[in-house]
Design a protein with these regions (language model features):
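Conserved N-terminal substructure of TIR/SEFIR domains
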Residues: 1-41, 139-150
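C-terminal interaction surface of TIR/SEFIR-family domains
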Residues: 26-29, 84-150
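Conserved beta-strand segments of the P-loop GTPase G domain that flank and frequently precede/overlap
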Residues: 47-51, 77-78
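Class I S-adenosyl-L-methionine
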Residues: 80-82
Length: 150
């Protein structure tokens, strides 16, 4: 979306680092190993979380392996929120935002192990998050929930 139109946008698609797989590929012998290889070569996980996010086997595996095995920080993008302020109530994440975590129980239950940065679907906020060294594996900050203050 933004990466193609803005070459300065700090996003590297880890899916492009391994060769493609076909829809009919076997989960255990092809898909799961490729997903894990991508995660081992990643500096963080970018999770787009909304009311329509599916708790699929691939998403569960990516979150579980990425957080619980690799310790990757997570940048959570909420497409249903369009400003930093819209995520917050009284300086903290709103309950409807936190309720979205229930869409992915493995994320909800594991996210306290790594730094997680919560941002709205706003280009500048996402750019700041992707450039923030506290949310990169080699330089990550302490495990906690983070968001940009308004």
């Amino acid at each position: 979306m933004w990466k193609g139109a803005d070459t300065s946008f700090p996003f590297a698609d880890s899916h492009a680092t391994t060769y493609s797989v076909r829809d009919g590929s076997d989960w255990e012998t092809t898909l799961k190993p490729r997903l894990r290889e991508r995660l081992r070569n990643s500096k963080n996980i970018v999770l787009v979380l909304s009311s329509t996010t599916a708790n699929s086997r691939a998403v569960r595996e990516e979150i579980d392996y990425g957080i619980n095995d690799q310790g990757l920080p997570v940048i959570v993008i909420y497409p249903e929120y369009d400003s930093k302020e819209s995520l917050l109530a009284n300086g903290s994440l709103k309950q409807p935002v936190k309720s979205l975590w229930d869409r992915l129980p493995i994320f909800r239950d594991s996210m306290s192990k790594v730094p997680t940065l919560h941002v709205p679907m706003v280009k500048v906020a996402i750019r700041d998050a992707l450039s923030n060294t506290g949310f990169m594996i080699a330089t990550k900050c302490n495990p906690d929930y983070y968001w940009y203050k308004t």
